[in-house]
Swiss-Prot record:
Record has Membrane as a keyword: no
Key words of the record: Cytoplasm, FAD, Flavoprotein, Methyltransferase, NAD, NADP, Transferase, tRNA processing
Protein name in UniProt: Methylenetetrahydrofolate--tRNA-(uracil-5-)-methyltransferase TrmFO
HAMAP family linked to this entry: TrmFO
Recorded GO CC terms: cytosol
Organism encoding this protein: Caulobacter vibrioides (strain ATCC 19089 / CIP 103742 / CB 15)
Gene: trmFO
Listed GO MF terms: flavin adenine dinucleotide binding; tRNA (uracil(54)-C5)-methyltransferase activity, 5,10-methylenetetrahydrofolate-dependent
Location, primary (coarse class): cytoplasm
Positions bound to FAD: 14-19
Length: 474
């Protein structure tokens, strides 16, 4: 229950991982917070979403894993470490309720949710209100605190609120499902086979006639690839997802099912492209990759949204010439998911440009994953509390995992020229951080074997991130 304070409250809408973390950070900063959660309406006592099973805060609907806890060599483990440094509620409760999972951080999900709920309920500056916020938050009146709001409603945002955001932002700025194509680390692409060229050498807005990476296939390779797509196991939609297909965004395996030649007349068409190494031989099909971030470290497979199970995606896509050793920053998928076009709508402190009283946090911003969602809640909570105190703060530097996520969702992503739908949710990965040169020798001056230099580079990037976060916190 909120106690007397010199500050007006901040309102947080949504009691998932992001909203719970945001509320905690605000309260820990000495600012009262009102957390609105619709999953149990006080008037009816009903849980009113399609996927949740309880009314507990920070309920983990799908997996019980926060993925790798290795801060030295794994980007999500680095994000864990940064959040722990900043007093994360989610990480503290996860550590308290972890279960054996090898190098991963997995939790007893009931114990975890109960702990989050208990800590927030017992905090003297937190008030939890069980209600749905239908539509946009109420207008501020100078006393009610609605001038400082965090929207952390997640992939199951209520229809009324989703429609209100859509009305505010305009058609095309809010997506109701994600159609995710795989993303590949540039350094793992074999450029001895692939080449850069835009179709018909057409220049884009940036004046670049070689904006795509092209991976050629002969007929035999194409036929084998189609066989693998058709045979590969597919993920089924959950009952509550109710995700529609539409022709502009069909999974590649669905296109292949419509006919073996469909893909080579669609996203894999070879027209307007010439292999500079063998210009007289025309490829039977071509897979194109498009730059996905401003750093040029990540490239997405154009038109390759897929429901293939993750276990077979890498194996299948490594059949493509030039991608034999591809390392994936993100695998493909198609899910129900409500998220905004953050690069156009949000500033660097995750405020909506059109209505700065509103901040967005969690999956609704276009991050993917439990940890990433909680991380955005952590930052928005700190931003909102700092604003309430009259001392705004900047985001962490982009060399940190936290800062890299903010940079990506607010500006690091490159639009593809085909509308807002090109922005898709992203997990944390080292490709979002400014690159470093792979070290050739270790701290003792010993030569690092070539195959281990990529791993050594990740450790240097993690060390840089934690050092830069310490400087930001100071």
């Amino acid at each position: 229950m909120t106690t007397n304070s010199t500050y007006q409250p901040v309102h947080v809408i949504g009691g998932g991982l992001a909203g719970s973390e945001a509320a905690w950070q605000i309260a820990q900063s000495g600012v009262p917070v009102i957390l609105h959660e619709m999953r149990k309406d006080d008037a009816t006592g009903k849980v009113i979403t399609d996927a949740h099973q309880t009314d507990g805060l920070a309920e983990m609907v799908c997996s019980n894993s926060f993925r790798s806890d290795d801060w030295q060599f794994n980007a999500v483990g680095l994000l864990h470490a940064e959040m722990r440094k900043l007093g994360s509620l989610i990480m503290s409760c996860a550590d308290q309720h972890q279960v054996p999972a090898g190098g991963a951080l997995a939790v007893d999900r009931d114990g975890f949710s109960t702990e989050v709920t208990k800590r927030l309920s017992q905090h003297p500056l937190v008030t939890i209100v069980r209600e749905e916020i239908a539509g946009l938050p109420p207008a501020p009146d100078g006393k009610n605190g609605w001038d400082n709001v965090i929207v952390a409603t997640g992939p199951l945002t209520s229809p009324a609120l989703a429609q209100a955001v859509l009305d505010l932002t305009g058609e095309g700025q809010l997506s109701f499902f994600d159609a995710i194509a795989p993303i590949i680390h540039f350094e793992s692409i074999n450029m001895d086979i692939a080449w850069r060229q835009s179709r018909y050498d057409k220049e884009g807005p940036g004046g670049d006639a070689a904006a795509y990476i092209n991976c050629p296939m002969n007929k035999e390779q194409y036929e084998a690839f189609i066989d693998a797509l058709l045979a590969g196991p597919k993920s089924e939609f959950k009952e509550w997802e109710n995700v529609p297909y539409f022709d502009g965004c069909l999974p590649i395996e669905v296109m292949a099912e419509r006919g073996r030649e469909t893909l080579r007349h669609g996203p894999m068409k070879p027209v307007g492209l010439t292999n500079p190494r063998d210009p007289l031989v025309k490829a039977y099909a071509i897979v194109q990759l498009r730059q996905d971030n401003a750093l040029g470290t990540l490239w997405n497979m154009v038109g390759f949204q897929t429901k293939l199970k993750h276990g077979v995606q890498a194996e299948t896509f490594r059949m493509i010439p030039g991608l034999e050793d591809a390392q994936f920053a993100r695998l493909g998928g198609l899910h129900r998911n409500t998220f905004i076009n953050s690069p156009k709508l949000l500033d660097k402190s995750l405020r909506m440009k059109a209505q700065p009283r509103l901040r967005f946090a969690g999956q609704v911003t276009g991050v993917e994953g439990y940890v990433e969602s909680a991380a955005m809640g952590l930052l928005t909570g700190r931003f909102a509390a700092a604003d309430r105190k009259g001392a705004p703060i900047d985001a962490p530097p982009p060399t940190t995992a936290l800062g890299a996520l903010v940079e990506h969702i607010t500006g690091g992503h490159l639009e593809a020229g085909n509308g807002p739908g090109s922005f898709q949710p992203m997990n944390i990965n080292y490709g979002l951080l400014p690159p470093l040169e792979a070290p050739k020798v270790d701290e003792d001056g010993k030569k690092i074997p070539l195959k281990e230099r990529g791993r050594a580079k990740k450790r240097l990037m993690s060390l840089r991130a934690l050092k830069d976060l310490d400087a930001w916190m100071a």
